[in-house]
């Protein structure tokens, strides 16, 4: 942690094809070992597949998927009197977006299709239709928060 105030949050540039900062952030989450070109190729190929299969604009499908994946509540461990409680807290907007992107990439990597662009396209389409592993993760997170609602008064 810096001694002289907080570090300024850097803003990402919108991507050149779709002119969207969200797409740039997805490329950054996809990127492994700094290979941005490879990550952007995978994403744009996945968006082409979405366009072919759904007939809709891929950016709209992706934004719908993000809306369905982003969590509203999560639990955070809080130690009180020698025992740990899972305290439900509201998720900040920037963290919601980050978690949504992280879960889409994580669960698309675990899918069984042959290429990563296929996996990503299918996971985004599933998320847009409110199915898929990323949406299930969000539901599980909300269930955990709901089950621990009794400890909500421990919020800080």
From Swiss-Prot:
Ranges that cross the membrane: none
Alphabetical list of InterPro entries matching this protein: Ribosomal_uS7, Ribosomal_uS7_bac/org-type, Ribosomal_uS7_CS, Ribosomal_uS7_dom, Ribosomal_uS7_dom_sf
Keyword RNA-binding tagged: yes
Any GO CC annotation of this UniProt entry: small ribosomal subunit
SUPFAM superfamilies named in the record: Ribosomal protein S7
Source organism superkingdom: Bacteria
Keywords assigned: Ribonucleoprotein, Ribosomal protein, RNA-binding, rRNA-binding, tRNA-binding
GO molecular function: rRNA binding; structural constituent of ribosome; tRNA binding
GO biological process: translation
Subunit structure: Part of the 30S ribosomal subunit. Contacts proteins S9 and S11.
Family to which this protein belongs: Belongs to the universal ribosomal protein uS7 family.
Function: One of the primary rRNA binding proteins, it binds directly to 16S rRNA where it nucleates assembly of the head domain of the 30S subunit. Is located at the subunit interface close to the decoding center, probably blocks exit of the E-site tRNA.
Stated name of the protein: Small ribosomal subunit protein uS7
Source taxonomy: Bacteria, Bacillati, Bacillota, Bacilli, Lactobacillales
């Amino acid at each position: 942690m810096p001694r002289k105030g907080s570090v300024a949050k850097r803003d990402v540039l919108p991507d050149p094809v779709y002119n969207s900062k969200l797409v740039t952030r997805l490329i950054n989450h996809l990127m492994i070992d700094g290979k941005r070109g490879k990550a952007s190729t995978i994403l744009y190929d996945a968006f082409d597949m979405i366009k072919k299969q759904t007939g809709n604009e891929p950016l709209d499908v992706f934004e719908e998927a993000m809306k369905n994946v982003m969590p509203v509540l999560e639990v955070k461990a809080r130690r009180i009197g020698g025992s740990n409680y899972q305290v439900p807290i509201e998720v900040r907007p920037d963290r919601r977006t980050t978690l949504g992107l992280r879960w889409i990439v994580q669960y698309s990597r675990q899918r069984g299709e042959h290429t990563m662009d296929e996996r990503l396209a299918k996971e985004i389409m599933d998320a847009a239709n409110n199915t898929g592993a990323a949406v299930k993760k969000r539901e599980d997170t909300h269930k955990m928060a709901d089950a621990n609602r009794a400890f909500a008064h421990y919020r800080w």
